[in-house]
């Protein structure tokens, strides 16, 4: 897929990702009638969330690289060459943000009673640290899964989905456990809070710095190990 195709795919997937989260909540709490305080309802919601992540993982594979999370685009851009980095930062990430904003606007138009998205419940620096730590681990895990089991779609998606869900639960009461600046930006834009210090530090600066740190850490720690493992293979051949 060419770069124009990737841009269009990013826009569509970002739009769909926001809608998917809302539809899961509507299905669990509206259609199935589970209370938001009912533990069994939360379990059902988590199951649907994992199914949703599998669907989007398949869509990413089917579109050969479509993304809906700016942090994934940033990690891919940093890991690639200079051209890839520029394309990710100045084209793909803005498009993913636009897709999220359009999705939230559409959701609010269709379901005016829908909530207002993630909310920060701790101090700004505490929130930035929380989102940063969650992001660091999920980026590190994603890169590790791509390298260690590149051909196993089910196993890679299963491990990644459980990890994302676990980290989301750990951070949900503090920052929402988002790990996706574009998704938060969509709701913040709808509330007129997209340029506040709280939003920029917690949901952008913290995760972006954590992503860069995770990519650097992975290259420094794991790449030499891979090279050492490749030497015996080269000798045997």
UniProtKB/Swiss-Prot annotation:
Membrane-related topology note: Multi-pass membrane protein
Instruction: Spell out the protein name for this chain.
Output: Probable aquaporin SIP2-1
Under the heading Gene3D superfamilies, the entry gives: Glycerol uptake facilitator protein
Q: Which UniProt keywords apply?
A: Endoplasmic reticulum, Membrane, Repeat, Transmembrane, Transmembrane helix, Transport
Motif (NPA 2) positions are 180-182
**Which InterPro entries does the UniProt entry name for this protein?**
Aquaporin-like, MIP, SIP2-1-like
Query: Which residue numbers does the motif NPA 1 cover?
Result: 69-71
The record's section on Pfam families has:
MIP
Q: One GO term of the cellular component aspect? A: endoplasmic reticulum membrane
Organism listed in the record: Arabidopsis thaliana (Mouse-ear cress)
**Where in or outside the cell?**
Endoplasmic reticulum membrane
């Amino acid at each position: 897929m060419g770069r124009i195709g990737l841009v269009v795919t990013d826009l569509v997937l970002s739009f769909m990702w926001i809608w998917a989260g809302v539809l899961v909540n509507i299905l669990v709490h509206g259609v199935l009638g589970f209370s938001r305080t009912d533990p069994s309802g939360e379990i059902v919601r988590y199951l649907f969330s994992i199914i949703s992540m599998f669907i989007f993982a398949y869509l990413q594979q089917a579109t050969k690289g479509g993304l809906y999370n700016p942090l994934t685009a940033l990690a891919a851009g940093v890991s690639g060459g200079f051209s890839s980095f520029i394309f990710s930062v100045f084209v793909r990430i803005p498009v993913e943000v636009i897709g999220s904003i359009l999705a939230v606007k559409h959701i609010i138009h269709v379901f005016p009673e829908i909530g207002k998205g993630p909310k920060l419940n701790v101090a700004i620096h505490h929130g930035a640290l929380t989102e940063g730590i969650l992001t660091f681990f999920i980026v590190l895990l994603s890169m590790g899964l791509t390298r260690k089991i590149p051909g196993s779609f089910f196993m890679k998606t299963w491990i990644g989905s459980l990890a994302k869900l676990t980290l989301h639960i750990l951070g949900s009461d503090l920052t929402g456990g988002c790990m996706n600046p574009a998704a938060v930006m969509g709701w913040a834009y709808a509330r007129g809070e997209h340029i506040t210090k709280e939003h920029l530090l917690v949901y952008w600066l913290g995760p972006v710095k954590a992503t860069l740190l995770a990519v650097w850490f992975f290259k420094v720690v794991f790449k030499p190990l891979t090279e050492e493992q490749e030497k015996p293979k080269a000798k045997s051949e």
